[in-house]
């Protein structure tokens, strides 16, 4: 999983209101050079959207995001999600994923939370909310004591700062919501999403 995410570099983070556009979304992201997406459990459509995305673009690394309960994790995996991402550490979710052999990326905001994940054998965690926590400065501070831990940074990431994040040795990838504007998704404007994905891909390739 880590190498797949490292190759993608930027994972689009998506709130989807209806499952219907998920197929076109997944194809547009792949065509734009970002074969990954984090579909968040912020709406009731999440599980069905994951199912549609996986069916339309089996080559895409489809994650479930904002997973707050083990039940949501189970729904996501049943729909085809390849990994579970959460904004914080819910050990119920972590333990369920580990028992099922499902990759899980819990959110961490403190050294203590990072160490809690390390005790579970996890070496990739989500730094969230990244910019509020200090962003690149925070990552540099964590690199010394936690040399064996890598991060997915999400929260406040934009085209203006994502390059600075990706240059950090302890960053695997960043999550970004700007690639899939809600208005474009609701309107089915996949050309706009494809273009934004290609622009993000160009940033990754320039690092």
For each feature predicted by the language model, list its residue ranges.
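Conserved N-terminal beta1-alpha1 strand-loop-helix module at the mouth
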Residues: 1-82, 99, 148, 159-160, ...
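Glycine-rich beta-to-alpha transition loops that act as phosphate-gripper elements at the mouths
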Residues: 15-17, 64-70, 86-90, 106-111, ...
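Conserved beta-strand positions in the central sheet of alpha/beta enzyme cores
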Residues: 38, 63, 85, 105, ...
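Short, charged, surface-exposed secondary-structure boundary motifs
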Residues: 74, 94-97, 115-119, 135-138, ...
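Glycine-rich phosphate-binding active-site loops on the catalytic face of alpha/beta enzymes
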Residues: 87-93, 126-135, 170-192
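Histidine/lysine/aspartate-rich catalytic loop segments that bind and position anionic ligands
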Residues: 90-124, 128-133
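Shared catalytic-loop signature of beta/alpha-barrel
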Residues: 116, 132, 137-152
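Glycine-rich beta-alpha junction loops
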Residues: 156-161, 178-180
């Amino acid at each position: 999983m880590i190498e797949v995410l490292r190759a993608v570099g930027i994972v689009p983070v998506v709130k989807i209101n209806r499952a219907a556009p998920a197929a076109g979304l997944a194809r547009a992201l792949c065509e734009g050079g970002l074969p990954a997406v984090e579909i968040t459990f912020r709406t009731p459509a999440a599980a069905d959207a994951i199912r549609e995305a996986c069916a339309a673009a089996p080559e895409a690394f489809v994650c479930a995001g904002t997973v707050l309960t083990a039940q949501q994790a189970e729904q996501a995996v049943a729909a085809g999600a390849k990994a579970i991402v959460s904004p914080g550490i819910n050990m119920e979710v972590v333990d369920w994923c580990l028992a099922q052999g499902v990759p899980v990326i819990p959110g961490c905001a403190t050294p203590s939370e990072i160490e809690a994940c390390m005790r579970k054998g996890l070496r990739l965690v989500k730094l969230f909310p990244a910019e509020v926590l200090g962003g690149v400065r925070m990552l540099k501070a964590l690199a010394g004591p936690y040399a064996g831990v890598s991060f997915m940074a999400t929260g406040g990431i934009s085209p203006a700062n994502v390059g600075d994040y990706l240059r950090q040795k302890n960053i695997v990838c960043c999550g970004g919501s700007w690639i899939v504007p809600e208005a474009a998704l609701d309107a089915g404007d996949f050309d706009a999403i494809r273009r934004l994905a290609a622009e993000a891909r160009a940033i990754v390739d320039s690092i």
